[in-house]
Amino acid sequence: MTEINKKILNLNSFLILLLPISFVVGSLIIEIITTILILQFIFFSLKEKNFSYFNNKIFIYFCIFYIFLLTSSLYSNYFSENYLNIIFYFRFIFFSFALYFFLIQDKNLLKKIYIFFPLIFFVIIFDGYWQYFFDENLLGYPKYRSDRISGFFKDDLILGSYLSRLVPLYLGITLFFIKNKFLTILNLLIILSTIVLIFLTGERAAFFKLIIFLLIIILIIDFKIVIKLSLISIIAFIFSIFIFFNPSLLERHYSQTIKQLFNYDYKKNEFNEIKIYPKNYLPMFTTSLKMFRNNKIIGQGP
């Protein structure tokens, strides 16, 4: 590999490391980084005449799915408004190939991610806890709701969703490099702090999905039963402490969920007529059903 190619490769590796941060900064930065990575991947593929990425079942299946999306979108009433988004769907598969390509080219990239991830998570979770305890984050962004925290996302209450999507990746990389005991313990502590912070954000969907994921991992991972029970006990104990000092967490995660799912009346202490969906979501369900009935085979498009 030439010196120029090495510099380009290092630049692309650096851009990959910046991806988690770019989600916090804004969608424009994400699009710029992904576009650069995709173009570089295509450039190197053409230069080296390596078309193996396009000659496999994954790419063929994606092409079939992509054609299906284009076809179904023609029947959409909003094609003129959304056609650009639909046409550029192909960038998802190219982005996946680009990541795989640069992981192969830079043998140390995964290790760089392993070292860089704790720094990102530490800043984000420290900022989240700071906002929880002091009602504003490190940049001075206030809480937009008393029972929710958003950190660097300002008025977008997506901190829990953001972290819950990164935790599986972070945990996977940590287990991959589990031989380094010090970093493994450090990363597990950061992951534990992240799980608690997701609970504190008040995002129930993100929290419950993460709990299901963690329970599955704890069940299938090759640890002693004592260690598994200890992990569950520690997490439950930490949750209990925060609930004790802030009962609104229990109200949001448990009481509101039971009320919405089972139409429970806490004042009368009884269940009313159980509904399978909240009242405010009924128009969405009925509209979706009508759209499906109009085009049962190929749908209405994305």
Model-based region annotation:
Residues M1-L84, F101-K111, I115, I173-I185, ...:
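Transmembrane signal-anchor hairpin modules in multi-pass inner-membrane enzymes, especially those
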Residues F126, I221-F271, T286-N294, P302:
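A membrane-periplasm/extracellular boundary helix in multi-pass inner-membrane enzymes
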Residues E31, F90-F92, N272-F285, K296-P302:
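Extracytoplasmic catalytic/substrate-binding loops of multi-pass membrane glycan-assembly enzymes
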Residues L17-L19, Y66, L70, F94, ...:
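Alpha-helical transmembrane segments of multi-pass inner-membrane proteins
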